[in-house]
C-alpha cells in the first residue's frame, strides 16, 4: 500500500480516537458545502504562490489528510507536501469512498469585505477572530475583533474563548493565515469563514450615506477600514466628487442611485495616506479633474486656487486656499453653509503639518488657515473632513462632520500661535505606511496598478493630530 494512501477505515479510526489530524478538503467550495467529512476544512488555493504560503503556516509535525472527489488530485498534492517534509496523506478514492455521514455547511467558507460590512451593519451575530500577530493587530483592526494569533490556534485550549453559537469570521492581512485558521477551528468542530483578501481588502470597502439639505444632496463615502471620507455633492441632477478613493467605479454607482451625474472631480490636496482615484474617476466619467495650482502634478488637470468657482446644477463651490497640511491644500465652500475641509480640520483634530518635512513653517500656515479662514465662518457652518480618526462616532444621521462652534472647542485651537506651533511640531505620530510612494503616485510621477493599491494602503490613516 502506498505509504501516503489512507483508507476510509483508517481515517475513521483516527477521528474516533481523536488523534490530532488536519483534514483538508480540496474540492470546489460548493461541493464541500453540500457535504463533507465532519472536522474537515475547505482548502482552495488560487495559485502556487498561495499554496506555498498556506503550507508555510501549517504545523509541520501534524498528520494531514487531503480529500478530493476521487483521490487523483489529492494524491498529487499529498506527494508534493510529503516532499516538503509534511506527514501528508490522501483519502483513497476520495470522498466517494467515504461511507459514513457527510455534514453540510451552515455558513459560507469565505466572505468578501463588502458582505462582512453588510453583516456588521445589520448587527448579525458574528465573532471576529483576528489571527495576526499582536503587533499587527495593535496597529489597526476591525472594531470588536478578538486577537488569537494563528501560531497559538493549534495549541490545545487556545480556542476556549471562541463561541460555538456565533458565525466565526477569521481575519488576517491577506486571507492566507485566516484560511489556515479555519483548518485549526475545524479540528474542534467549529465552523468558520475566512475574510477574502484580509485587512488589505477590508480597507477597500466603501460605504455611502446620504444627507439631504434642501436642494443639496451630500453623499458621504467612507472607506470603512481607513476612515477616509469622500463627498459627492449634488444639485439638480449634477454632482461634483471631492477626494475620491478606490474603487473609483463605486462613485458612479452611488451618484446614480441618487439620480446624479458626475460632472467634475476634485482633490483637495496631494494625499499621503491613500491613493487618489480622482484621475481615474475623471477619465471614467469623461469629466474635468480639478487640482490645486499650488501643488506640482504630472497629470492633465484644470488648475484652481483661491476665489475660483466650480458650478454644478444650480449651485457652485467656492475655492479657498487653506495651507498647512500641505502648501497647496484647498477647502471648498458651498452656500456659506458647508465647508469641505480636506485634511485641514477634522472632527477630532487637525491636519498634521510634518509630512513634507517643513513642520514649523507649515504649522504656522495651518494656524493662520484655521483661525483666519475656517473659524471665521458662522458657528453653525458644517465642516466635512476627508478623514475621521479611530473611535470617532458619526452624527445621528450617520454622517461625519463637525461645526465651527464645535471645532472651536478643540484643545489645539485654544492655543496662541506660538503655543500652537510649538505643540503641533512636538507631537510625534508614526507616518502613514508607504506615504512617500503614495505621494509620488498621487503627483503622477510614478504609475500604479489597481492590484497594488490594497497593499499600499494597508494600515490606519495617520494624517491628523490631536491633544
PLM region descriptions:
Residues 163-169, 248-290:
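Active-site metal-binding motif and surrounding structural segment of the metallo-beta-lactamase
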Residues 141, 266-274, 325, 329, ...:
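Histidine-centered divalent metal-coordination motifs
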Residues 1-22, 28-127, 133-167, 173-240, ...:
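Rhodanese-like catalytic fold shared by cysteine-dependent sulfurtransferases
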Residues 38-43, 143-144, 353-360, 406:
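Short glycine-enriched, charge-decorated loop/helix-capping segments at active-site entrances
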Residues 209-262, 299-388:
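Catalytic core of the metallo-beta-lactamase
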Residues 183-188, 208-210, 368-382, 386-467:
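Accessory terminal helices/loops
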Residues 91, 195, 290-293, 342, ...:
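Generic beta-sheet signal
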